[in-house]
A protein has these predicted regions:
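Alpha-helical segment that forms one wall of the substrate-binding/catalytic cleft
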Residues: 16-82, 90-97
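Short glycine- and hydrophobic/aromatic-rich loop-to-beta-strand nucleating segment
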Residues: 12-14
Length: 97
């Protein structure tokens, strides 16, 4: 599955720069894998978790991390939790929770 104008792949719509951030944080995720493996749901979930472990932290945000923070970081990058542009995505996620 490819979307976001062809820039993102897989069930979690992961961009290559997102993948690079995650595997830089957790190099074990790069072993025997490439970006294209983000089309695999289980691998993509590991990438998302590593990305959150890197950016969705209480130390970084300055308060306990919420589901909203995680969703908005996933959608808008490391500072996505601050961006107005990610609120629409959060509303979509809320409907699925």
């Amino acid at each position: 599955m490819q979307s976001d104008n062809g820039n993102a792949i897989g069930p979690y719509q992961i961009w290559e720069i997102y993948w690079k951030d995650a595997v830089e944080f957790n190099p074990s995720l790069r072993k025997n894998h490439t970006y294209e493996d983000c089309t695999n749901k289980e691998y993509a979930e590991q990438i998302v978790l590593a990305y959150w472990q890197r950016y969705a932290t209480e130390k970084r945000i300055g308060r306990p991390v919420t589901k909203e923070d995680r969703a908005r970081i996933h959608n808008g990058g490391p500072n996505g939790y601050k961006k107005k542009a990610t609120l629409k995505y959060w509303k979509k996620v809320q409907k699925e929770l």
